Amino acid sequence: MCIRDSSNGKPHKLRLYSIASTRHGDNFEGNTVSLCVRQLQYEKDGQTINGVCSTYLCDIKPGDKVKITGPVGKEMLLPEDEDANIVMLATGTGIAPMRAYLRRMFEPSEREKNNWNFKGKAWLFMGAPKSANLLYEEDLQRYLANYPDNFKYTKAISREQQNAKGGRMYIQDRVTESANELFNLIEDEKTHIYLCGLKGMEPGIDEAMTKAAHEKGLDWSELRPQLRKAGRWHVETY
């Protein structure tokens, strides 16, 4: 998305956003696209600074015209194999591509339109500070109820839950808790792992994966490049 600077008429840097809908759109007619946007705000020199593009998107009104480009890249595409297992690790608005995946897998109207009929296991690890920050919760609970054999949903709510050491519960703590089951899936060549959210989540996930792999007698520093080379490790952080 390209926005022009009102002070000099020149365009700002292009902003990339993950698409939160399938190619059929939320209305299943193929003429809409959905985004998941949180307005960026930060303090600088005693002033509150608003992010340029996120503020623009949050302030536009129904009927306003917006020029966009894309889609860009193939990093986060789902595999063609209907029997693939999909492990998703997300924080905040990083839920966007995961929402698109889960709609494609489990939304009834979407399944009717797809030649691709998901039969594998989907496991979403979602990190948020509070329960109120969890997005698309109603849809996720519906998928859990309708597809209990195919969908698992694990939440890490840092300000409401505690980890095993009594500290705040983060997504990497949930990964460590689920080490055995998670790496049983990863050892299956049909399993793909998708990571999306703030770049700061990567070190914690790597540390958790290292511990989890060790419990299975595996070396994560060797395994991760192998997964990447095989096209099974997908990362989109910002």
Roles of regions detected by a PLM:
Residues 97, 102:
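Phosphate-binding glycine-rich loops and their immediate beta-loop-alpha structural context
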Residues 90-96:
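Ser/Thr-glycine-rich phosphate-binding loops at phosphate-binding pockets of nucleotides
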Residues 53, 64-75, 106-109, 113-238:
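Reductase modules of NAD(P)H-dependent flavoproteins
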Residues 6, 10, 89, 127, ...:
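Generic amphipathic alpha-helical segments used as scaffolds and interaction surfaces in large
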Residues 5-8, 59-61, 92, 164-168, ...:
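N-terminal start-of-chain detector that recognizes signal peptides
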Residues 4-87, 103-113, 147, 158, ...:
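FAD-binding FR-type
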